[in-house]
Design a protein with these regions (language model features):
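Non-catalytic, soluble scaffold/interaction modules
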Residues: 53-83, 100-105, 242-256, 274, ...
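Active-site-adjacent beta-strand anchor residues
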Residues: 61, 128-129, 153, 208
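Short, glycine-rich nucleotide/cofactor-binding loops
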Residues: 3, 15-21, 37, 125-127, ...
Length: 291
């Protein structure tokens, strides 16, 4: 693996606008497994140092996405605490640990979705925003149980289209709306269900911009607002709040207006007081019991 390839991998994670936090975390682990097998090194110590540097760079590429940081931190800790007898053993250990964490992430998504599907039950209309792997899996579990969906387009790149396409293939009735229409449609839903890119220790949720006003609309109209995500997305009490990433204004496809500043902040923060329940792989967590 060359320095050019290394930089291309970092750029891939940094510039990805279509995959969610968990998917990018698993992709980062996949890249680390590939690097473990192919990265030039003279001995196990050099390999470990080069892999650790790559993991740190991948973690820093998407500061709003906690699962990348948490899963890669766990991988780094395993690498630092394990002593491989030789270079071949070090390669095998690093790759296997990355693959084990990828599998753990997939299991957590499946378990989280199972708890969410049980909470929602059959015959429900659910409104969602952006694209979440746990929400997609929940929809798959409920697709033959009378599920109806309301999907926001999720500008600027409209990742809601991907969910709409899947629901259409599953023959799940769905309504596709602009983000600006959430206040009009939230009352038609039995529940709002979103994923998360990060959850703070107090239960506040960092997710695609538009989640906060959706939570406000849901609270105003008496519709429960559920957040389903794996525990890998939760930040420790002493972790600083994640950066709310801002992307290129060009994504909004606006003219060059003199004196006008175009902003494209991708994430917002929804206070814990607006969350009806958090659903993780360990079950449903209600506010009275703490997040």
């Amino acid at each position: 693996m060359t320095l050019t390839q290394f930089n291309l991998w970092i750029a891939e994670i940094r510039n990805d606008r279509t995959r969610g936090a968990s998917e990018l975390a698993r992709r980062s682990l996949e890249l680390l497994a590939e690097a473990a097998r192919s990265l030039p090194a003279t001995d196990a110590v050099e390999l470990r140092e080069r892999l650790l540097a790559l993991a740190v760079a991948l973690s820093a590429a998407r500061p709003s996405m906690t699962p990348i940081q948490n899963l890669l931190r766990r991988w780094r800790e395993t690498l630092q605490s394990s002593a491989a007898p030789n270079l071949a053993g070090a390669r095998c250990l690093a790759a296997e640990q990355a693959e084990l964490l990828m599998a753990a992430s997939w299991r957590a998504v499946a378990e989280c979705a199972a708890h969410t599907a049980e909470l929602l039950g059959p015959g429900r209309t659910v409104l969602t925003h952006s694209l979440s792997s746990t929400v997609v899996e929940t929809c798959r579990l409920l697709k033959d149980a009378g599920l109806r969906m309301i999907i926001t387009e999720s500008r600027p790149l409209e990742e809601g289209r991907q969910l709409a396409e899947r629901l259409s293939a599953w023959n799940v009735p769905a309504t596709y709306i602009t983000d600006a229409q959430i206040g009009l449609f939230v009352a038609q839903a039995d529940a709002v269900l979103v994923g998360a890119d990060s959850v703070l220790a107090d239960g506040a949720v960092v997710n695609k911009a538009g989640t906060y006003p959706l939570a406000l609309a849901a609270r105003d109209q008496g519709v429960p607002f559920y957040v389903c995500c794996e525990r890998f997305k939760w930040r420790a009490l002493d972790d600083p709040p994640p950066e709310l990433e801002e992307m290129a204004p060009a994504e909004l496809d606006t003219p060059n207006w003199p004196g006008v500043t175009v902003r494209n902040v991708y994430f917002d923060r929804t206070p814990a007081r607006l969350v009806s329940a958090w659903i993780t792989e360990t079950g449903v967590h209600w506010p009275d019991a703490g997040p």
